[in-house]
Amino acid sequence: MNWLFLVSLVFFCGVSTHPALAMSSNRLLKLANKSPKKIIPLKDSSFENILAPPHENAYIVALFTATAPEIGCSLCLELESEYDTIVASWFDDHPDAKSSNSDTSIFFTKVNLEDPSKTIPKAFQFFQLNNVPRLFIFKPNSPSILDHSVISISTDTGSERMKQIIQAIKQFSQVNDFSLHLPMDWTPIITSTIITFITVLLFKKQSKLMFSIISSRIIWATLSTFFIICMISAYMFNQIRNTQLAGVGPKGEVMYFLPNEFQHQFAIETQVMVLIYGTLAALVVVLVKGIQFLRSHLYPETKKAYFIDAILASFCALFIYVFFAALTTVFTIKSPAYPFPLLRLSAPFK
């Protein structure tokens, strides 16, 4: 009787400490289908049950992130939508989360620190995470929940980073039928269609006007200047590196410029610099040519013409000074050692 009791006790302990915590693939699939994005949330009460092995040939990918503005994790914000795209790509081809070439399944989970004022998720404490984002993959027959592999997250952005993550998942799981499906961006197609339609219509209805516009020196000068300003403001750099629009500061504020960084920038920095350079160029043109044009067409016979010219020139010079001060402020933010600031205009740009 004692022998039978001991055997039963050992069997019960072994089952309850290891397999009982594990979830079947069907249960994981039900949890994934309950989520709108097919991502299983790792709650404090259930994350151990979800991640604990064995998983019946199921690999589980877990993202630990913190999108709270107070944290200031710009990479977390970037990875948020990229992770959604990766998960959607897998489930679009595999609605049952199972590979077409094998019995292997892949599920995706996530725990997010959205409000630092509340308690830190237990999953963060359990895995002793000191930084985010972190990407783990749990194998089906690992000895314990702590036996997992880390998927490195590169500094590349957009599709390149998503492809690298998918490639890492394929290597760990030996699943070959995992492809990235990027959502179709209809904006450039619709924009190109509308512009083409309007251009063809104008050429058909107003051919003389369109040819006069095309042959206009002013139009070509404006377009050439705008192109040069965009290039010197790192527009091409943004297109090549696919830089993020803006950053998040330590207090949750929006960052327009990367301090002390001449080699890196946010995309919005290009927009600000185009505005500054474009305004300066326009003001110089108005100062040199515009005032004369206004005088000859609006007040050619006015006795106080020179007085009006002086007022307009003074306003142009004042605005040139203000925008040039903004330009030097940007240089000061990018390099605090820059010794020639004109005005303290740093507040709008930080």
UniProtKB/Swiss-Prot annotation:
Residues 23-182, 239-273, 328-350 are lumenal. Residues 29-171 form the Thioredoxin domain. Residues 1-22 form the signal peptide. GO terms for molecular function: dolichyl-diphosphooligosaccharide-protein glycotransferase activity; protein-disulfide reductase activity. The chain crosses the membrane at residues 183-203, 218-238, 274-294, 307-327. Belongs to the OST3/OST6 family. Subunit of the oligosaccharyl transferase (OST) complex that catalyzes the initial transfer of a defined glycan (Glc(3)Man(9)GlcNAc(2) in eukaryotes) from the lipid carrier dolichol-pyrophosphate to an asparagine residue within an Asn-X-Ser/Thr consensus motif in nascent polypeptide chains, the first step in protein N-glycosylation. N-glycosylation occurs cotranslationally and the complex associates with the Sec61 complex at the channel-forming translocon complex that mediates protein translocation across the endoplasmic reticulum (ER). All subunits are required for a maximal enzyme activity. This is Dolichyl-diphosphooligosaccharide--protein glycosyltransferase subunit 3. The lineage of its organism: Eukaryota, Fungi, Dikarya, Ascomycota, Saccharomycotina. The gene is OST3.
